[in-house]
């Protein structure tokens, strides 16, 4: 078998939807977790530098930020493992579907995995194919563990609902920083607003970031404009935007996973001719 033919067979058996979704998932989670972690750190510095001089005022906020950062560590680890499992499940179900439709130009791993669903035969032994059959046996064992695509569909559906809430929550800091930036623009260009510059403020207490008895709790006028011009504010604002984009990319990847897995499961269930799940 030539190299070109081998590559062609691998491409035919590859689950492209799962591959794209996996890449998008890893990219989105990395963007969300990395940028979100640094954005929370930047927010902590801005609060303690400009909005409150008393540590007790923002002690609870710091504890919440640190808790969210630990959650981010766990989220990154979980999605790395779950994304790899979903990719393996994509190879598994795609190989089984192609075998049902009579397309045997699948990869060795795809054949090994699909054998656990369709009851296909194992490869014929030979000295030259010893390594190939070893890989097939490993994939066959993996297929027994992955042989519940309906459960993967259910778990992915529940995870998508949870991540939809995460996506909505990731928009909150973007909204707060955007409002602050808009206020700064009004201060920088007073001709665009009828309000006096001194009355234009950013109040962290209004968003529940600080308690109402925090002092000063808000920054107004030219002081607020100077904060908006700092590199810390600009970087934190853009990091939250990047984290929001990462959450959106992860949501799209989960939807892609769910659609592809549901389609493959439906095909196997309806056309598997006695397939057992």
UniProtKB/Swiss-Prot annotation:
Topology in membrane: Multi-pass membrane protein
Record keywords: Cell membrane, Disease variant, Disulfide bond, Lipoprotein, Membrane, Palmitate, Phosphoprotein, Transmembrane, Transmembrane helix
One of the Pfam families matching this protein, by short name: Myelin_PLP
Superkingdom field: Eukaryota
CC annotations in GO: myelin sheath; plasma membrane
Localization (cell): Cell membrane; Myelin membrane
Covalent lipidation (O-palmitoyl serine), chain numbering: 199
UniProt topological domain (Extracellular) ranges: 37-59, 179-238
Topological domains, Cytoplasmic: 1-10, 89-151, 269-277
Disease named in the record: Defects in PLP1 are the cause of 'shaking pup' disease; a dysmyelinating disease.
Function as written in the Swiss-Prot or TrEMBL entry: This is the major myelin protein from the central nervous system. It plays an important role in the formation or maintenance of the multilamellar structure of myelin.
Record-given protein name: Myelin proteolipid protein
Organism annotation: Canis lupus familiaris (Dog)
Species classification: Eukaryota, Metazoa, Chordata, Craniata, Vertebrata
